[in-house]
Amino acid sequence: MPQPSRPRKGSMGFSPRKRAESEVPRIRSWASNDGAPGVQGFAGYKAGMTQVLMVNDEANSPREGMEEAVPVTVVETPPMRAVALRAYEDTPYGSKPLTEVWGREFDTSLERTLDLPNEDTFEDDAAALRDDAETGDIDDVRLITHTLPAGMRNIPKKTPDVMETRVGGGTLTDRVEFGLDLISDGGEHEISDIFRAGEYLDAAGVTKGKGTQGPVKRFGVQKRKGKHARQGYRRRIGNLGPWNPSRVRSTVPQQGQTGYHQRTELNKRLIEIGNGDEPTVDGGFVGYGEVDGPYALIKGSLPGPDQRLLRFRTAVRPSDQPRLDPEVRYVSTASNQG
């Protein structure tokens, strides 16, 4: 009988499979942007899923120009605020923060999570940052942004989610000026200022937590068959490894934490950006409620349960860019409750 040969069950690229440290996803890499300076990311809260009827605009597709049903995730995207600009310098040990410039106005809910400055030092700090940019002492700039969940009736919390978002495009001096102008004007920005319907983006979020699970569900190993199953166990692996080396290797699939991991999905297509209650299904989204404000429709599913924070960035590995502004003819409002 030939020996079966196949790749191992379960990817080692996701090790260690432990709980995420924070529900605010951490973005470690950003796309290079050669256009005008601008913010490269945004965030929203997952509401649920529905489907739309849209015209297939994929070039050279056999169904090009035909109407088709597409599943979409509805994400509520209220405006965000930028409160500070942080400058980084490259060192042999990675990028390190060099200086910060804080704005003048802050939302009252921000005091729940940050120690805000008591004095207005914006002009002096901004002048020092401009000098550092001209002399080449800094290599990158990022905005400290936050959400405003206190004004959302479907998000049961008042504490904003704080995150860093890169400023891309133009020269470093252009990016510094863009960031300073943004925070001096209050820092409010919307998803339509960053993305356009039809383009690709990357979505990051923390997946649904499933607690402790066995190796069959956690890694996808096969259940025991035949006489091996009649030994009393079907959902256990056959052994923990060889006699030598006399230890259990980390590659052995075992039971443990499943879910509540940060995952980033690449090249999710933004179908529509809107404002209002058009995508709200009859009776509201289960576990969320009604969407009545700025929203985005993303093709396909996204990680995490309803009400989970999702972060978006400009695509770092974009494939062939599809056509912008796709034609959406109908958004289904059929109830999720049957």
UniProtKB/Swiss-Prot annotation:
Q: Where is this region: Disordered?
A: 1-37
Instruction: State the Gene Ontology BP annotations.
Output: translation
Instruction: Cite a GO CC annotation.
Output: cytosolic large ribosomal subunit
For the keyword tRNA processing, the answer is no
Kindly name one Pfam family recorded for this protein.
Ribosomal_L3
Keywords for this entry? Ribonucleoprotein, Ribosomal protein, RNA-binding, rRNA-binding
Give GO MF terms, alphabetically. Answer: rRNA binding; structural constituent of ribosome
- Report the family membership: Belongs to the universal ribosomal protein uL3 family.
Quaternary state and partners of this protein?
Part of the 50S ribosomal subunit. Forms a cluster with proteins L14 and L24e.
Role description: One of the primary rRNA binding proteins, it binds directly near the 3'-end of the 23S rRNA, where it nucleates assembly of the 50S subunit.
How is this protein named in the record? Large ribosomal subunit protein uL3
Species of origin: Haloquadratum walsbyi (strain DSM 16790 / HBSQ001)
Q: Which gene specifies this protein's sequence?
A: rpl3
